[in-house]
Amino acid sequence: MTEPLLMHLENNVYLEGEDALIIIDRRKLPRSEAEVYCTDHVEVARAIEQMMVQGAGDIAITAGYGLYLAARELERQNDGRDMAVLKQAADRLCATRPTGFHLAALMGKLLERVRKHAGGKASEIILAVLNKSLTRQREISQATGRQAETLLASGDTVLTHCFAGAGLLYMFKYAKENGKVIKAICTETRPYLQGARLTAWSLSEMGIDTTLITDNMAAYCMSKGMIQKVFTAADRIAMDGAVANKVGTLQLAICARHMGIPFYILGYGGPDRRTLRGNDIPIEERDPREVLEFQGTPITGERVQAYYPAFDITPPELITGIVTVSGVHKPLKIASA
């Protein structure tokens, strides 16, 4: 089975030498694998803001490389232990995508490690943590995929939304290895089309029977018995079992509940234990022009306004189960995961 580009982050976000980060621009996939060179943390932050990297875990590690570049710059200036400057860089990187919790958690961990190991080079300390984080992220994705695969029955068609990360790809991989015939229906996920460009493409590269639909077709497909299960990811899971994910997740959960279709969240490492309630999760609001244009071309009149919340909150009562490395959990019991 072909392993798609997005199954392993190190294939599309990686260092070139010691002072440059290469990011494969996901906005250009699958038509081209355009390389973007970042030489400082500000360029990394802009790349994240401009959606060149997507997915909470991948964004966090990419931002970690941004902090590494900030440390390298300080070391070239013979001021490699200036924690105030590193903190400013971390704050800039954290501000790029405020809804997901992985980014802020990793930034805090990296700064703490640098403070703790006062005798070492900050860039080397950061890079060592990032290498371990990459390995751990792969292990978590694989374990989550294995847990999720047990929920599938041969003959199922799974509805996906946006790009749910490597765990989703591993779920399909393990199902295929176990002889299960599983199909996918992917929402295109406006306005950046992650479902079309990333999820549908990746699954088709793996040999999965994959069908693309527009976002407004999901309820119809459910009503016709075309979908047996729904799987999405989570940018943040609150301790009350509420989930923040790509906008549109809530409406899929409502439709799935009405149709009696199981709705699962790939929760990877589990909840953010500092976020008690879903209502506490900040919702990123992006530039409305991203809705008014498609690949730079206006799609409506000049007087039309737009609104673009990038995420929504799905309450626990609409979620069948949250899949983590440790198993499948009822949303209201996710605090014990």
Protein language model features and the residues they cover:
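Short, glycine-rich nucleotide/cofactor-binding loops
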Residues: 35-41, 157-165, 239-244
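Positively charged, low-complexity intrinsically disordered leader regions
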Residues: 2-42, 49
